[in-house]
Amino acid sequence: MSAIIDIHAREILDSRGNPTVEVEVRLESGAFGRAAVPSGASTGAHEAVELRDGDKARYGGKGVLRAVESVNGEIFDTLSGLEATEQVAIDSIMIELDGTPNKNRLGANAILGVSLAVAKAAADELDQPLYRYVGGTNARTLPVPMMNIINGGAHADNPIDIQEFMVMPVGAETCADSIRMGAEIFHALKKKLKDAGHNTAVGDEGGFAPNLKSTDEALGFIMKAVEAAGYRPGEDVLLALDAASTEFYRNGRYELAGEGKSLDAAGMVAYWQDLVGRYPIVSVEDGMAEDDWDGWKALTDAIGGSVQLVGDDLFVTNPTRLSEGISRGIANSILVKVNQIGSLTETLEAVRIAQSNGYTAVMSHRSGETEDSTIADLAVATNCGQIKTGSLSRSDRIAKYNQLIRIEEGLGRARIFPGRAALKRG
């Protein structure tokens, strides 16, 4: 009864007003699954390929009708009649059908949309929540959120070089409480910024995007907001940063234009050592550029013993690149974005490799999101303990937090909220 009888894709809009792919899968039993594919702004060069139309007369070339056609044509013809519960086989068939190393023929956006919608349909068939279907009976760890409350870099039109300034409410007793704490800090920050004469417009991920002069100024405002909300920085609330360093890496140097600094790899490592020494920063994502492996090694050797060093553009949720990084002793954590690799099976494999090698994993959104809340379920399914899904505004971000609240309620007394322990590596 779990045989696939229909797969239908359409072009919808994401949170930035750009087209993306939505896929619906229907099974013989009547079970149904729907998934929408996210899209990034600061994308890694090694990511799977999002298939765009390139027709400048339509959505500025960003249309996804070719990807939609891939789903409604070749992919449906190939998967029709197969059992939706055979996720690994279905994903493998689509990858083989595409026939390229980076999914550029059918499009990672096409393959991922089908992959996630199939999983949702199978969960519906078995009358299980998605996190339980994917993760089994042991899926019960709620993630600590990394909440991006000040946006810079490619996510905002301001001078700040660092892309994301995040708070982690580790002192909460439940996931719902951590979300409440984050919301209180968010509103306290808004007041602090307004009182100082700064604008409180928000960036792509719902965080504020004020015209601040430096990383220090941004961190200073966040520290004051945490205290104004009644919490202790370094105890109740920890800080995390996403540098997206590849975005300002030019000719072997890190060009921090907003701060007027031009640093070599050693200088960039020293920059991070200074910051983590002065603020309760426990996690730095993409602290070095995606292909600066020597720089990454130096950073890991310098602060990796005490700071979570997350590879996003570095690893692009790719099991092969992650395995190489592990063998070279680079970073100690992976950011997990389903659309970077383009299938549920490969995403879960990346998390498995990370966790089995003592690396942490952080489930993540993209800057271009939809109301789809799949990543909330995947965070719980993988027991990864951390999630990055934006600030406390914009419904495309809040949808994930609300789903976590529902999941926690459904788990009842079985739920685990790790708090600070989420940062501990195996």
From Swiss-Prot:
**Swiss-Prot/TrEMBL keywords:** Cytoplasm, Glycolysis, Lyase, Magnesium, Metal-binding, Secreted
Q: Where in the cell is it found?
A: Cytoplasm; Secreted; Cell surface
Enzyme Commission number, as recorded: 4.2.1.11
One GO BP:
glycolytic process
Which CDD domains does the UniProt record give? enolase
Quick check: keyword Magnesium in the entry?
A: yes
Q: Which reaction does it catalyse?
A: (2R)-2-phosphoglycerate = phosphoenolpyruvate + H2O
Q: What cellular component terms from Gene Ontology apply here?
A: cell surface; extracellular region; phosphopyruvate hydratase complex
Summarize where (2R)-2-phosphoglycerate binds, as residue positions. Answer: Q163, K337, R366, S367, K388
**Superkingdom to which the source organism belongs:** Bacteria
Similarity-based family:
Belongs to the enolase family.
The molecule here is called Enolase
